[in-house]
Design a protein with these regions (language model features):
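Glycine-rich N-terminal segment of FAD-binding domains in flavoprotein oxidoreductases
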Residues: 26-51
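Glycine-rich beta-strand-to-loop/alpha-helix junction loops that act as flexible
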Residues: 34-39, 132-136, 187
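Ligand-binding beta-strand-loop-alpha-helix segment within the catalytic cores
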Residues: 56-131
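ATP/nucleoside-binding phosphotransfer catalytic cores, i.e., glycine-rich phosphate-binding loops
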Residues: 180-232
Length: 232
């Protein structure tokens, strides 16, 4: 595991925000995939304020999501809705740079539409940067243990939460693995045990998608806070 440990979650998101500035200064579109969850909320809040809101050249950044729940953007469960509320409402970014999963649509229709958008905008399927979280069950995006097909050649998949049955759309493992860079942003003491297990056990012996999904031709790194890393 390629880990970087920060004193707090805020330190970790500040590092990511600084990297957004650098990516935005490249003279070409940069495709970044965002994650849901509590730590990314901290990231979006940080990006919406000085100095980052002013320093980032937003027109060069294109935003996507690793997954989203099939709910309208106004629903508190919507990953896109969280970013809109905490970040997009506070900055100037071209509407065409935001590539959301339309959770208000019928899932099969939206799966097809989203895959078509992915193919049209990123024909080679290679994201510049995919930021992922990890649940205490080892899931990432909406790819859950014991139900993820790691060989699925599609770009996206309809997934069902194993407990709630809630329907989501997620990027597939294969699409994620094509990225130039994957960063798992994992914070909090509740993740310490599973991180220890991932660090000490070969991925093929674990059911956790977060342990298995790595950039095939790029960099995979784990940004942790001290609480999450306490057993490493």
């Amino acid at each position: 595991m390629n880990t970087i440990t920060f004193p707090t979650a805020q330190h970790a998101v500040e590092k990511i925000a600084q990297e957004f500035v650098i990516y935005s200064q490249l003279n070409h579109p940069v495709h970044i995939s965002l994650s849901g969850g509590s730590t990314p909320k901290l990231l979006f809040k940080t990006l919406a304020k000085a100095p980052y809101a002013e320093q980032i050249n937003w027109k060069n950044l294109h935003f996507w999501w690793g997954d989203d729940r099939m709910v309208p953007p106004t629903d508190s469960e919507s990953n896109y809705g969280e970013v809109q509320k905490r970040l997009f409402d506070h900055i100037q970014i071209p509407a065409e740079n935001i590539h959301r999963i339309r959770g208000e649509n019928e899932p099969h229709f939206e799966l097809k539409r989203f895959e078509e958008e992915l193919s049209a905008v990123i024909p080679n399927g290679i994201f510049d940067w995919i930021i992922l979280g990890m649940g205490t069950d080892g899931h990432t995006a909406s790819l859950f243990p014991h139900q993820t097909n790691f060989d699925d050649e599609n770009l996206a998949v309809i997934a069902k939460h194993p407990e709630s049955g809630q329907i989501r759309i997620s990027k597939t493992a294969k699409l994620i693995e094509q990225a130039k860079r994957i960063t798992y942003l994992v914070t909090g003491e509740s993740k310490a045990d599973i991180l220890k297990e991932i660090q000490t056990t070969p991925a093929e012996n674990l059911p956790y998608p977060a342990a298995k999904i790595k950039a095939k031709n790029g960099v995979t790194e784990w940004y942790l806070d001290k609480a999450a890393a306490k057993l490493l």
